[in-house]
Amino acid sequence: MQVAQGALRQGALYDLLDREQPETDLRTATVNALMQRFAVDTAHAERVAATACALFRQAAAPGSERAERKLEWAAKLHEVGCRISHSDYHRHGAYILDNTDAAGFALPELHRLGILVLGQRGKVRKLEADLSDASFALQLICLRLAVALCHARRAPDITEMQLLMEPGTFTLKIPSRWPQAFPQSAHLLQEEMVAWQKTPWELRVQAD
């Protein structure tokens, strides 16, 4: 009996191809299982994920589908730590993702999701070492904006919002009437602008 190396290589190739197809990617099923295991509010998780991904698509370069899917997973798992504590749920969520058995995920992938979950709130400077990666910075700001915009646990209307990305700068364009219509959300956006100060990136909110 001889080992058929060619067949193994072909099989591995098919596994890799399946892994990058949303319909057959085991990681999607794993994320759903983690949501169920830690009693995540599915409706809110999907609301935040949809908002984050919509903003991401506005600013991302063509061919960023993989980064968008990872953002979607991080958004769906952003409250996974609430099962442990509501006060520091972002920290607990990051710990869970760093220490869980998640089929289909490589350890660096899980760590990256954990970093996004950790960075969803609080100071951005704690992740400064990761912010040199423009794709990661975009994922992070989209997640943070989505969490802020969905603070009332309702789907925000972002149809007239536009997120732009330039070297070192993010610009969120909002309708001129929006701050008056949604004062709490406008306040959270102001806080978000402050959070990005003293980092390699600047967030501007522009009312047109």
Kindly label every feature range from the protein language model:
Residues Y14, E128-A129, P183-A186:
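Short conserved micro-motifs at the rims of enzyme active sites and ligand-binding pockets
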Residues A152-Q206:
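Low-complexity, glycine/alanine/valine/leucine- and proline-rich hydrophobic stretches
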Residues Q2-E23, A181:
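Hydrophobic/aromatic-enriched cytosolic interaction surfaces used to assemble or bind macromolecules
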Residues Y14-R19, A75-E79, M165-F170:
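Core structural elements
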Residues Q5, A75, R121, I174-S176, ...:
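Active-site proximal loops enriched in glycine and acidic residues that flank catalytic Cys/His/Asp
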Residues Q2-G6, A106, L110-H111, V205-Q206:
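Conserved phosphate-binding/catalytic loops in two-lobed NTP-binding clefts
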Residues L17-R37:
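Long, charged amphipathic helices and adjacent flexible linkers at domain junctions
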Residues N32-Q36, A43-M165:
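Divalent metal-dependent catalytic cores for phosphoryl transfer on phosphate-bearing substrates
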